[in-house]
Curated annotation (Swiss-Prot):
InterPro entries found in the cross-reference section: MoaC, MoaC_bact/euk, MoaC_sf, MoCo_biosynth_MoaA/MoaC, Mopterin_CF_biosynth-C_dom
Family matches, as Pfam families: MoaC (PF01967)
Assembly and oligomerization: Homohexamer; trimer of dimers.
Keyword Glycosyltransferase: no
Pathway info: Cofactor biosynthesis; molybdopterin biosynthesis
Keyword terms of this UniProt record: Lyase, Molybdenum cofactor biosynthesis
Protein name per Swiss-Prot or TrEMBL: Cyclic pyranopterin monophosphate synthase
The gene coding this protein: moaC
Keyword Glycoprotein carried by entry: no
Length: 163
């Protein structure tokens, strides 16, 4: 396992110097889900939530969040993102109606975009919670993780499909 890179020799936090790293195409895909009551999922699916188009607004919130990641996570580098895409799947897994969010983020740069993909997913799911909390305060955000990343010196990572 590699050592932690966000600490200097004295143990002080610092932003990693990426100036000497080559710019390469970087891609990260993250996912997560929000579980809810069947009636809440039906509201989202029908587009009749009081606050409007839940998934449309969650998509925009996720895109904005990816772009603002370095403002939220102190040691993240500001990046020129070349693509941010969010997809939603409505499903009933067992007895848990849910919305699954998947974010794909890309850049050409010296550092990866995993944090941007994770931030996009989290904020999109939080937006769904915010827009539906009046009818379902028991929603649960869960299973947020990186599915895959490509590019850079460390190469590719694919999450174990078994979890």
């Amino acid at each position: 396992m590699s050592s932690l890179t966000h600490f200097d020799a004295q143990g002080q936090a610092h932003m990693v110097d990426v100036a000497a790293k080559p710019a390469t195409h970087r891609v990260a895909v993250a996912t997560g889900r929000i579980e809810m009551q069947p009636a809440t999922l039906a509201l989202i699916e029908s587009g009749t939530a009081k606050k409007g188009d839940v998934l449309g607004i969650a998509r925009i919130a996720g895109i904005q969040a990816a772009k603002k990641t370095s403002d939220l996570i102190p040691l993240c580098h500001p990046l020129a993102l070349t693509r941010v895409a969010l997809a939603f799947a409505l499903a009933e897994k067992g007895n848990a109606p849910q919305v699954v969010c998947t974010a794909t983020v890309e850049t050409v740069g010296p550092t990866g975009v995993e944090m941007e993909a994770l931030t996009a997913v989290q904020v999109a799911l939080l937006t769904i919670y915010d827009m539906c909390k009046a009818v379902d305060r028991g929603m649960r955000i869960t299973d947020v993780h990186v599915l895959e990343k490509h590019g850079g010196k460390s190469g590719s990572y694919l999450a174990d499909p078994q979890g």
